[in-house]
């Protein structure tokens, strides 16, 4: 009886050990199998650096900063480009595992068209690395494979159709923020607007300990002695909170010749930290021709024809900007003072 009991206990222990061993092995197998399917990083707050490389040799590094992303260590990244990219990183899902017959085509597409994506955390540790390739014939799925894995998958974004690579495949200035001005009123130290052909309307507005001061830009312009319009300085400065360009034109053939022309306006903003932003605006007449009289320097048909400007930003970037966006900045020196007729 005692011998039978001992054998029974030994059998149960052995069986439990085998079950535990098999269970552990199955869990490990399941974990490994799931690792090559888990493309999404659910918490985008964990991602501090994104590295993207394609077969053309393009290399893109995006790094998280306080309130924005930095492109290639130098430029602010455009929010409207970053938002869909971050959305894809957090929501990408496996749609299905392709049949064996389709594997060769997928692997070939990933090899020839694949974009490598590497995601890093705050400490610089790699979170995930994978390749994003071509799309299915119906354009509703994208080929993806985890770095180091052998099994490719068809992935997608729920409630969105298209190839995920369009959210990754950007080049050069396409990544960059097109903002010309972005300052809160309380953080603006001064703004000057120079109109080279309308000097009497050029001015400097400055925040002083005694309040806002508006004075002529040119010394030869007589100062206006009429009372200020109440709230006019704040009404003007609020326009600088968000002013964006339409597109970069850094490779435009006529950039150098246009930059040598007398601009319509030179707008200079200095913030409370001492950072200066300057934009020189050159009007564009319909047909993309700069119409400037060689003798007088006056722009032809300016009042009715100007729809866009070339904007020279800080002497470094050349952009296209719309008149409808910029016109709110075109105040004159007299705009800040009460009308003479109202004082009589």
Task: Please provide the spans of the model-predicted regions.
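Soluble, acidic/polar mature domains that operate outside membranes
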Residues: 1-344
